[in-house]
C-alpha cells in the first residue's frame, strides 16, 4: 500500500498547505503552494515533522499519513480556486451533462485526474462565487444534486474589487433572486475578507455591513466572515491599499458590532478559519464545506471527515476541488488564488467550454488517471 502526504508549511508564522504525492519539489513559488524536491522513498506509518531550509526560508513540514489508493470522498468544491459560476458556468453544465471532469494536479501539470460527476457518487457541491447570474436560468439542471452557494458580497469599491458589477444594481438583486429560487438555507453570505486602511475603517465596515444586512438578511441564514491573511502574493498585490494590520481589539470590536447587526436582521455570524474565540458574541467557527448542512439539505447522513489539507482552524470536510488557480477574472486585490492577473487573463483566453479541462486541452505529455470515488452517504 502507498500513501499520499499533506505538507503543512509555516513560513514566518503564515500557514500554507499543499497536498502532494511522495515526491515533491521545493522552490519558493507560488506563495500559497510549496513545491518540494525531497524524494521520500519509504511508506509513512505515522505522522512526523521535518525541517527544510530553502531559499533563505525555514519550513516546518508536517507529514500526515493518508491512503493514496483509497476512494475519494465525493463532495465537490466549485471552487476555492476560481469563480466558476461567474466565468465558467457553461463549461460546468457541460461537465455535469457528461458526468466527468478533468483536473490538472497543481503540483504536476502533466498529471490529470478524471473525476466522476455522476449524481450517483457526488454527495454534494459547494459553489463559490461573487456573481451567480450566468447560472440562474439553468438552476433546474442541478436538481439531481445536493448543493448550496457560498456567495461573497463585500462593501469594497473597485479599487479593491475592480471587475465586480454594481453591488446595488446587479449583485444584491442576484443574491435575492438566487435565494428566492433555491431557498435561503442554500445561500451563505460571505463578508470576507475584512481589512482596514484609511478608507475602509471600522466605521466604514460597520456602516455598510448594516446596509447589506438590511438587504440580504431575509435571504440567508448566516454570514461568514474572516480577516485578510497576507500571503506573499496578497501582500504584493494589496500594496497600493496600504493595509493596516488589525489588532485583536479591533477584531473583537468589529465582531461584536457585526453580531448585533446580524441579530437585528435575523441571521447569525460565524468565522472562516479564524483562531480567535468569539463565543461571548455568539459567533462560532464556520464549516464552509459543511457536513451538517449537506445532511440537512439531503436528508441523509454522510461518512466524511474534516479535511486534513486545510488550516487547523478550518472546519471544512474533505472535498475535491474542480477549479484551477490563475483563472479568475474578478481581479480582487486580496485574492490568494491568482498569483498573476496577467496569467489569469492568458489562461482564460484558451478556455474552451466543451473541453473537460477548465482551460486548455489534453496534450501528448499528459497522463490521465481516473480517481477512485464512491458516495459517502449512509442512507
Where do the language-model regions lie?
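Intrinsic-disorder-associated, low-complexity terminal segments enriched in Asp/Asn/His/Tyr and depleted
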Residues: 4, 15, 42, 46-47, ...
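Cysteine-centered motifs
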Residues: 26, 36-38, 51, 62
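Conserved AdoMet/S-adenosylmethionine-binding subsite of the radical SAM
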Residues: 76-255
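Catalytic cores of enzyme domains
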Residues: 220-325
